[in-house]
From Swiss-Prot:
Keyword Thylakoid: yes
Gene expressing this chain: psaE
Protein name, per record: Photosystem I reaction center subunit IV
Gene3D superfamilies referenced in this protein's UniProt entry, alphabetically: 2.30.30.50
Signal peptide segment: none
Any one Gene Ontology cellular component term annotated for this protein: plasma membrane-derived thylakoid membrane
Its job: Stabilizes the interaction between PsaC and the PSI core, assists the docking of the ferredoxin to PSI and interacts with ferredoxin-NADP oxidoreductase.
Compartmental location: Cellular thylakoid membrane
Source organism (scientific name): Mastigocladus laminosus (Fischerella sp.)
Length: 71
């Protein structure tokens, strides 16, 4: 299960970032959204964009988000 802050690998073959690793920026909770997961990358694509929306089945979690320290 991907969550905000997770490091994910992209499985969509037609994507510029195919097989690259990005960080989940947010996940939309609506049930009718086709690509609810916004992923941010370190490098930009041809248009100068560094984010893209993906479906959960197009992502594999590589690293879980870091736990926040308790106060």
């Amino acid at each position: 299960m991907v969550q905000r802050g997770s490091k994910v690998r992209i499985l969509r073959p037609e994507s510029y970032w195919f097989q690259d690793i990005g960080t989940v920026a947010s996940i939309e909770q609506g049930g009718t959204i086709r690509y609810p997961v916004i992923v941010r990358f370190d490098k930009v694509n041809y248009a100068g964009v560094n984010t893209n929306n993906f479906a959960e089945y197009e992502l594999v979690e590589v690293e879980a988000p870091k736990a926040k320290p308790k106060k």
